[in-house]
Amino acid sequence: MISLQEAAAIVDASLRHAREQGLAPMTVAVLDARGCTVCLKVEDGSSLLRPEIASGKAWSALGMGFGTRNLAFRAASLPSFFGALAALADGRVLPVPGGVLIRSRHGQIR
């Protein structure tokens, strides 16, 4: 499992990178392998739904076992499958880039 300290370091590094790139205000969420939120930070100016979006991207990557950039590509070519998947997951699947799996050096999801 990922620790709070590790999750916070990932969130902080992600936000730092976003600032260096001049991106709009960000929200970053890190979930553990169970899908529970370990750390979530919302930058000033980030819009109302951003926490749900960030968590949805992370949850989708966990649920499918690969990042959401790949998920978005697959959703474009299999819309009926992803419509059914969204229904099965109570609308929580978010097939858009941004969700990344965090793995141990042995390949286990953290």
Label for each model-derived stretch:
Residues 1-110:
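Flexible, solvent-exposed loop/hinge segments and secondary-structure transition points
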